[in-house]
Amino acid sequence: MEHNIPELVAQLTLEEKAGLCSGADFWHTKTVERLGIPTLMVSDGPHGLRTQDPERDDPNHSRKAVCFPAGCSVAASFDPDLARREGAAIGREARAFGVGVVLGPAINIKRSPLCGRNFEYYSEDPVLAGELAAGYINGVQSQGVGTSIKHFAANNQEYRRMSASSDMTERTLREIYLPAFETAVKKSQPWTVMCSYNRVNDVFASESRMLLTDILRTEWNFKGFVMSDWGAVADRVKGVAAGLDLEMPGSGGVNDAKIVAAVKAGTLSEAALNKAVIRILNIVFRAADEAAAPAPELDLKGDHTIAAELAKECAVLLQNRGVLPLKKGSKVVYIGGFAKTPRYQGGGSSHINTIRVDSALEMAESHGRRVSYVEGFPADLDQREEEEFLRAVSAAAEADAAVIFAGLPESFESEGFDRSHMRLPESQNNLIARVAAVQKNTVVVLHTGSPVECPWANDVNAVLCMYLGGEGVGAAADALLWGDANPSGRLPETWPLRLEDTPCYLDFPGDGRHVEYREGVYVGYRWYDARKMPVLWPFGHGLSYTGFVYRNAQLTADEFAEGDSVRVRVSVKNVGMMPGKEVVQLYVADCTGTTGRPPKELRKFVKVKLEPGEEKQVEFTLTAQDLSYYDETLGSWYAAPGEYKILLGHSSRDIHATLSVRFSTPRRRPFVIAENTTIGELSKDDRTAAIIQQVLAQAGNALTGGNAGGSEIASSEAVAQMLDSMPLRGIVNFGGPAAAGMITPLLEILRAAIQ
């Protein structure tokens, strides 16, 4: 249906326009009945609906809905199509419930494993997070329901999240904390974006024109409206001017009155207010038009089945020394409260009132497996009961295998607070160690929203991470443990050996007012690889019950130029006896030496399904953007000319093929040549390298105290290192041919070379 929104806005009073820019309550926008402006209903959350029960006044009492795998699990699938399928199922439920916008996905970068909301977020890597977000958004919006991608931007902790400032360089912001949002906006155009509580470089996100207008709308061409996180508005008038359209929930009219007063006083332009109202009404009427079509039939039972299927794809087999899959008919004891009452979702705004929850124990019994159960430790407490502890150890010793279901209780990680350590409850660690001592076939199944320290990792036979797999997690665990399904998940985040190894250990969570992002772009695997640090399990890691080999990696060209592209091809073969899925990961390494960069960065990935003996060729296309970093001097992305390595592999530390490509570009970084410009800087620039080498050759003995001829100067390692940091004026000081009267002509020659 056609709606002339600008004409409608022209008929609104100033007070009505201000009122439309805030919520009517927790979940609805305001109406203007005289002009036929309807309400828009929004609902949490990213992995299932938390929709207020219309029979209850309590905004936290929600209707029954299906809990799908949380963001931490979806990310482990490395499969944007899986994210799309989850989104589509949530979108169908939203349509049936009358929801116009789903408040998700949540895609903040996992800067530290301690962040209490990491279970809701996707990854430490912006490429992975962005591709999954785009898939999810496309899925939800394919059902005629909008999304609200959140939390924009740099909301990476819960401590003081409503006021702390995330302080970082522009390069760090652009390379790590914004790209996932950019990918999602450009590939899927979410109907709305939710701004975060925090400040970014001392400016509240809700008041940042740079974020909400300059970057989001001007650079990325975002077409929807921006809403606040619940209670995130600091200065409503500044927010409207910056590009914050909708305040949620409403302020009881307080902020509406401030908008009216500011317009009347001339401190806020009515044109800015009109833009906000137009953007809101575009989505309000779009949602109303979609809702006018017949809604799909609500099928919670079918969606539960989908949730369980998705959970199988998201589980990560971290290690396996031959015990998995469990042998059919073997005598197995399940230990741990999570076997009976799994932790399948996180706490906070995304908490879902589920229709049912499968447990691994229930599913094993329903399939007639030879499984016994001993609690060993409770699911929700760090508590050791000696009798139960000893029963578990005894049962493990008598079984063919012991499967311990461990993980973090909700009291350990949730929205609203951060963890202070990475440890599992001591009752769990102690029991795992004791069981492993008496049973060589010990398997640990982890239910957690974020990495944990695993001091017993070398003592157990296998570790299967289910993350927070949704209400079907028990069915998924059962299928994976017993070989009815093959694990294909990969880690979307590095699992460090200990908390002290993490990139922001000294700066998380900050002093309360400011959080210094001193690690810069070295987040996650970028940090561990740059420091060559051992980790427990690397980014991208995940095992299978089958095997894969890579062959015939090749480039379509050995070099390419700005504006062109190059294709990368590699064949992958399943060499095992079971169908499986391999995640081919492509990393880029900058060999130009132009600036400090991580040793490698994920740029592409694809999940490939292969039958036993089947081989498929996968292909990636690379452009200059895939080689680029954000150059603050240029104020834009930049790929330096020179050599780049293309790495293809199974994880960030399991590379199967390395290729080399050269890149050329007419673009150059600004190069100001003066007396203090170093020999090293001039030698690395292909426009000045030959000139400076000639000068060095002429300088000869003067630079080395008579110990080396001019022809040897560049090959002497000690001298080369000294010269690398020597300024041009140093040649003068050593009495070379560029002495006093020659420095000016030399500068002119060098400057002319870079014009």
Give short role names for the model-derived ranges.
Residues 1-4, 662-664, 755:
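Basic/polar N-terminal segments that are highly enriched at the extreme N-terminus
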Residues 1-628, 643-648, 652:
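Glycoside hydrolase catalytic-domain context in secreted enzymes
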Residues 624-667:
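Terminal connector regions
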Residues 677-744:
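Conserved, compact domain cores that house catalytic/ligand-binding motifs in diverse enzymes
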